[in-house]
Regions:
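Bacterial lipoprotein signal-peptidase II cleavage site
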Residues: 24-36
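Short active-site neighborhood of thiol/selenol oxidoreductases, capturing the structured segment around
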Residues: 193-207
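Typically the conserved alpha-helix immediately C-terminal to a functionally engaged Cys/Sec
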Residues: 211-225
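A short, hydrophobic beta-strand/beta-hairpin element that forms part of a small beta-sheet core
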Residues: 260-273
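Thiol-/selenol-based redox modules, centered on thioredoxin-like
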Residues: 276-294
């Protein structure tokens, strides 16, 4: 059994330190601002867990200052776009770039920038934001054999998730407020047998250690309203009880050590995308369009 302490400490430090991001250029004003037009010293905060493997890698980051993560209404103008390079941390060689990421903030008080990069080798890398420090923020690409959570290209394992008809010992089956969400009508096992694409979210709106689970569920609910006939949408909680002291079986079945995670499969149950830690409805829609599922 995974303890709450192990589960929480296994997650990335959402409010932890990052690399200082310093520029002296004046803000350009409006939503057209870019990373080269920020005027104050900021930090890069990694918004991703250490489960990245070679291939197309998603690298979401946020910006912070000495007072914490920057929000949309915090008085600091946040760039609409960031530009970066990925470099080998040992040699300093640029391996990917330049790449850009748009700001995502739909339904979120703290926006993020989801970079995408094709990194084909195991190792330690840094993401260097234009206008930022020379050391950037670290990225570790792991050997897939060392990662136990389902990866893109692998089959999503069947699991009898709690439903409104059978909570399977999980109470409540959903901590979304003001009432349980509508994504608990079918088990993951049964959904995999339908031969339809699946969006499977594991996260807890009420007890999320990163503060992103409730917005993630709200984003998924928005998407499900449009695609409920062509895809199956399922939500599972992180904890067995509302006391948030016992990790739910759904978490152990996936070997998760962070939250939330959204697994998207094709009609054969193969994971074609996994969004970790932070995402909004716009990014989910973009992913589904890219995958040809919308």
């Amino acid at each position: 059994m995974i303890s709450r302490r192990r589960f929480i400490t296994g997650a990335f430090a959402i409010a932890g330190g990052g690399s200082a991001l310093t520029t002296v250029a004046a803000c350009s004003g409006g939503s057209s601002a870019t990373s080269s037009s920020m005027s104050t010293e900021l930090q890069i905060v990694q918004r991703f867990p250490q489960v990245l493997v070679p291939g197309n890698v998603r690298i979401p980051v946020s910006l912070a200052n000495n007072d914490g993560l920057l929000s949309m209404d915090g008085g600091t103008e946040l760039p609409a776009t960031l530009t970066a390079n990925i470099v080998n941390a040992e040699t300093g060689e640029i391996v990917v770039g330049p790449i850009t990421a748009k700001r995502h903030d739909k339904g979120l008080s703290i926006p993020y920038y989801p970079f995408r990069a094709d990194i084909e080798e195991v190792g330690i890398f840094s993401i260097l934001i234009d206008g930022g420090p020379t050391d950037g923020a670290g990225i570790q690409i792991m050997d897939p054999s060392q990662i136990s959570i389902p990866l893109v290209g692998s089959a999503l394992p069947p699991f009898d998730t709690p439903t409104v008809d059978n909570n399977r010992g999980v109470n409540p089956i959903c901590t979304y407020l003001p009432a349980a969400c509508s994504l608990h009508n079918i088990t993951l096992t049964d959904a995999l047998a339908l031969g339809k694409p699946i969006a499977y979210l594991v996260g807890t709106p009420a007890h999320c250690s990163t503060g992103t689970c409730s917005p993630a569920l709200e984003a998924l609910l928005q998407v499900s309203e449009k695609l409920a006939d062509s895809m199956t949408f399922i939500h599972a909680e992180i904890y067995t009880y509302d006391t948030a002291t016992v990790v739910a079986p759904a978490v152990e079945a996936l070997n998760m050590t962070y939250e939330p995670a959204l697994f998207i499969t094709d009609a054969q149950g193969i994971v074609v995308e996994r969004l970790d830690a932070v995402f909004d409805a716009d990014e989910i829609n973009e992913v589904l369009v890219t995958l040809g599922l919308q």
